[in-house]
Amino acid sequence: MMLYLTHGNGEESMPLKLPASSSQVEEIDIRLDDICSGEGNFRISDVKSSVKGLWQFIRNADLLKPKELEKLNRLSRHINVMSEKERQIFTGALLSESVSSLDDVLRTVGRIRLYEIIPEVTCDRELGGYLVEHGRIDCPEHLKPYLDYVGINV
């Protein structure tokens, strides 16, 4: 995973490959302070990752805090060993969960095994039907015609 870091208005950015050390982050912070005009926080301006849309979930991480950097390093290590299918599942899980912090992202990556991709399901009604027909939700046969399949997956 590659982070692009900047200061201020983001006219210049520098890459940081994760996992990284705090000394690497501090060095980039100092270099950016010299080349970026204007005042502003040291921040993540972009993320290149095999997990689509990851930037929106980690952009507020404060890399100058060692605990935040360690969390990002852990996330990077998780992603580095994921298969393509696991990365797709992770992308979907991030979009379906209420993710508002780096801790939420790490919790989600830790629960990847609880998610699955069901290719034949494209809407709520199909998901409800899939869950009932495949025994994920126990329902007596005589009640199936009366089920609200759209509401089942909620």
PLM regions: where:
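Long amphipathic alpha-helical segments
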Residues: 46-136
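N-terminal interaction modules that seed assembly of large macromolecular complexes
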Residues: 10-74
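Acidic, proline/glycine-rich low-complexity IDRs
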Residues: 128-154
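Residues that form generic nucleotide/phosphate-binding pockets
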Residues: 28-31, 35, 78, 93, ...
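Intrinsically disordered, low-complexity segments enriched in small/polar residues
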Residues: 2, 113, 144-147
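A short beta-strand micro-motif
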Residues: 1-8
